[in-house]
Design a protein with these regions (language model features):
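Short helix-loop-beta-strand segments that form the rim/entrance of peptidase-like active sites
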Residues: 85-103, 110, 239-251
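Mature extracellular/periplasmic domains of secretome proteins
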Residues: 83-87, 105-128, 137-155, 165-181, ...
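Bacterial N-terminal signal peptides
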Residues: 25-35
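Extracellular S/T/G-rich loop segment that most often corresponds to the catalytic His/Ser-adjacent loop
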Residues: 43-51, 171-238, 261, 267-270
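Active-site core segment of subtilase-fold serine proteases
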Residues: 42-95, 110-113, 117-122, 188, ...
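Sec-dependent signal peptide cleavage junction
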Residues: 37-41
């Protein structure tokens, strides 16, 4: 069974047996990672980020924009994503594949090319997609399926602005079964997770995580936190096929008991 089928089936198993969710152990994933530290993976985990570039001179990668070879990030989005992932997985090999100059200029062609390169050239273990497309794309879906078949875990944001976009309307690629969809939450004064009208919630959401990053906020940053957590888990010996189950066991329930169609398995407490 290839990883894409495994992830699809894992989602199906969990969501159709949501009533059993209370039996899952309420593990603090970061503590579990510390306990797993002696059995580290031999190879460094590679995280590919498809985004707006990165202003860190130490970040490897390439640009898929026509006429531009530089990784320079003119909007700062990709740089913040890189930083959050590195905070969560400091030993990971982070690769930036620049696919757009601004969050409003996300085009399919460079993204599709970058997805294939992520697994064929850079051998990505995890791929971070902190952006959305409103319409489904066969070419992009094929690229996602291909990347999953090569063993990559793909993490994407559910999106923002639920009032203007429509409650429960999750954009692509998070809406595909093969992708782990992440929604954002805010933290209140007590450090507890709270939902916000700023974030999208719906059927394609698998997990929620805090969405703040300095003065910015969005499910893009929630996604980066989950990507960092996944990379750290892989680095500590968790198999890619077990990642979804591992995260589900660690999530703090939100909304209806167990898995639900708004918050998925719930909140992952990630710094």
């Amino acid at each position: 069974m290839n990883p894409a089928e495994r992830l699809h089936n894992m989602k199906h198993i969990f969501t159709t047996n949501a009533g059993r969710a209370s039996a899952l152990p309420a593990i603090l994933l970061l503590l579990a990672l510390l306990l797993c530290a002696p059995c580290r993976a031999e190879e460094t985990v590679t995280v590919c980020i498809l985004d707006s570039g990165c202003n860190d001179n130490h970040t490897a990668g390439e640009s898929f924009l026509e006429g531009s070879e530089a990784l320079t990030d003119t909007v700062g989005h990709g740089t913040r994503i890189c930083s959050l992932i590195r905070e969560g997985a400091p030993e990971a090999n982070v690769v930036m594949l620049k696919c757009f100059d601004g969050q409003d200029s996300v085009n399919e062609e460079p993204i599709v090319a970058a997805l294939y390169a992520a697994v064929d050239v850079y051998h990505a273990d995890v791929i971070n997609l902190s952006w959305t497309l409103a319409d489904e794309s066969d070419a992009l879906h094929e690229a996602v399926l291909y990347a999953c078949s090569k063993g990559a875990v793909i993490v994407a944001c559910a999106g923002n602005l639920s009032l203007s976009t429509g409650l429960g309307t999750i954009a692509y690629p998070a809406a595909w079964d093969e992708v782990i969809g992440v929604a954002g939450v805010d933290l209140n004064a007590q450090g507890e997770a709270e939902t916000s009208l700023w974030y999208l919630y719906g059927k394609a959401v698998d997990f929620c995580a805090r969405g703040d990053c300095g003065d910015e906020k969005g499910s893009s940053y929630s996604t980066a936190r989950v990507t960092g957590l996944i990379a750290a888990a892989l680095q500590n010996g968790v198999a890619a096929e077990q990642i979804y189950e591992y995260l589900a066991a660690a999530a703090q329930d939100m909304g209806e008991p167990g898995f639900d169609d708004r918050y998925g398995w719930g909140y992952l407490e990630i710094p």
